[in-house]
Amino acid sequence: MPLLSQMQDQSGTTFAQLEALRQKLREYEYYYHVLDNPLVPDAEYDRLMNELKNLEWQHPEWITADSPTQRVGAKPLDGFAQVTHEIPMLSLDNAFSDEELDGFLRRMESYITEDPHTLAFCCEPKLDGLAVSILYVDGVLSQAATRGDGTTGEDITSNIRTVRNIPLKLNMDNPPARLEVRGEVFMPQKGFETLNERALEKGEKTFANPRNAAAGSLRQLDPKITRQRPLVLNAYGIGVYESDDELPATHFERLQWLKSIGIPVNNEIRLATGREQLLAFYADIQAKRPTLGYDIDGTVLKVNDIGLQEQLGFISRSPRWAIAYKFPAQEEMTVLNDVEFQVGRTGAITPVAKLEPVFVAGVTVSNATLHNGDEIERLGIVIGDTVIIRRAGDVIPQIVGVVMERRPENAKKIEFPTACPVCESAVVRVEGEAVARCTGGLFCGAQRKEALKHFVSRKAMDIDGVGEKLIEQLMERELVHTPADLFKLEHTTLMRLERMGGKSAQNALNSIEKAKNTTLARFLFALGIRDVGEATAQNLANHFHNLDAIRAATFEQLQEVQDVGEVVANRIVRFWQEPHNVTVVEDLISQGIHWQDVVQVEIADNPLKGKSVVLTGTLTQLTRDQAKALLQSFGCKVSGSVSSKTDYLIAGEKAGSKLAKAQELGVKVLTEQEFIALTGEN
């Protein structure tokens, strides 16, 4: 009987060739999901995957448990089997202050001779997900379980097999007989937002936060559902290990070894020695928190030396050699006192929760957005409820849950207005949209005010001498009705306003005069066309080059512009069909607003064409906005963070962590002068 590796079918395809195809797909998955550096386009990966599926369909006897096709998922389960952890998955003690961190360091002095303040620690972000155990037997994923109570968890093997960045087979020649990888499964913020958006479109229940979404996804009885969820694993340690080869002697080196055999490990892990470096890591990660792209709730600090870890040992539920230094709480409970309804620039009616003030994530919160009527219904919230407030980074505080058992008897239902609270025009909700809108248009004072505030904002016309309070006064006295009226103001008129002296009035007029010289992209953005943001305005300017061409563009021509679909194209067409809008634009131009028409840049052979670029540091010859606009004219994607997908980093003066990360990843770094030279600008 021939060996399995020598078997072949009637077409001449051998098992060895099939296995080579699997190995190629595993390599592509590793580079795509772990290194974030795809080797081939998605279409090529899909073609090879289909080829493998067809071959395995013809030869079911050739299917192996570690085949990439086996991620698709098994049949739905009736329930989860229990798994006993050979080595308990203990939790960590927490520290919430520098003093508590000092206490952690002091406690170690009783168990080791070394000074804890001179020890090396492996420092990791504390990921906000679900702890899991993944067992590899002879290099093949064999079993996965949740942490559960630390002793017993649930068997989630079928679901873990669907997580794209978890290898089904280790990337090594002589794998351990048994290797238990421990890590955190979480959902990146972008994936979470997309998941909730799709749920809303389907009228399904949304998740309150990424952690709940990750946990709910892993505990699906149908693995095919889990497969559709954007889950990610980051390993943080090793449990069971059986092999003739010894593991590295430090925790940091063990994580690097895991990474080398295909197990994903977080990129922010660092070594630190002593109290000051530990605190510096904490501060650094806290500062990065809003831009990481995934939720963390603190740092995890572990003694790096494995021998010292063993000396320090454990207390009843946690190791003595590690601690979680947590950030200030991002969720707190408070009472919903009332709901007010605000009217935005486009007429959107937004319910705003008025809360009993509560301290959350370092600030006192008394207001929180409720988004729209659907969100109120989803939460099942009423006035008087005790609610859970969440504030993450710079995100506007939001209500994520209701404590039903605390609902008072006098709780009051929230009534969504049928008439605008400002102008009393009818409020309507367009089919397919979650937002209700005032139909008053610019008849509505709230919409006029917000439109003017948008027009003068920094990224629009950048009239820094005209702020929100001045706009309110100008509108109250009916001195300004449209943006064009700003350019008709006189010194004597401004002098009659409250807290407006001669110098302040002149500064405002100087800012207004300066704003007349702008760019086509800024002007388009300032007009406040619904869904035309900075990037879309820049794309329109780059595509059509002048305002007349944009005004004359048809629905079909507009859709030829990058990122302009049917909805946005329709809104642009409708904007120019409204006589009032045309009058305002012509009035603005008659007041002297001007710009240079966009010159089509020859980018056929330019190295910047279509690249992903990050700006960092202080630029001296261009403003940040000018540099961004210049890059976009070359079709560049301007990103805020460095990754392996970044093509160029443009580094100005005092470039910091982004420069270091770019150098670490081998990203091409340009000085400001080199960047300008590439663009051909003088």
Curated annotation (Swiss-Prot):
Phylogenetic lineage: Bacteria, Pseudomonadati, Pseudomonadota, Gammaproteobacteria, Pasteurellales
Species of the source: Actinobacillus pleuropneumoniae serotype 3 (strain JL03)
- Which reaction equations make up its catalytic activity? NAD(+) + (deoxyribonucleotide)n-3'-hydroxyl + 5'-phospho-(deoxyribonucleotide)m = (deoxyribonucleotide)n+m + AMP + beta-nicotinamide D-nucleotide
Q: Per its UniProt record, what PANTHER family does this chain match?
A: CHROMOSOME TRANSMISSION FIDELITY FACTOR 18, DNA LIGASE
Name the domain of life: Bacteria
Pfam families linked to this entry: BRCT, DNA_ligase_aden, DNA_ligase_OB, DNA_ligase_ZBD, HHH_2, HHH_5, Nlig-Ia
For this record, an example GO cellular component is: cytosol
Q: Where is the active site?
A: 126 (n6-amp-lysine intermediate)
The protein's name in its UniProt record: DNA ligase
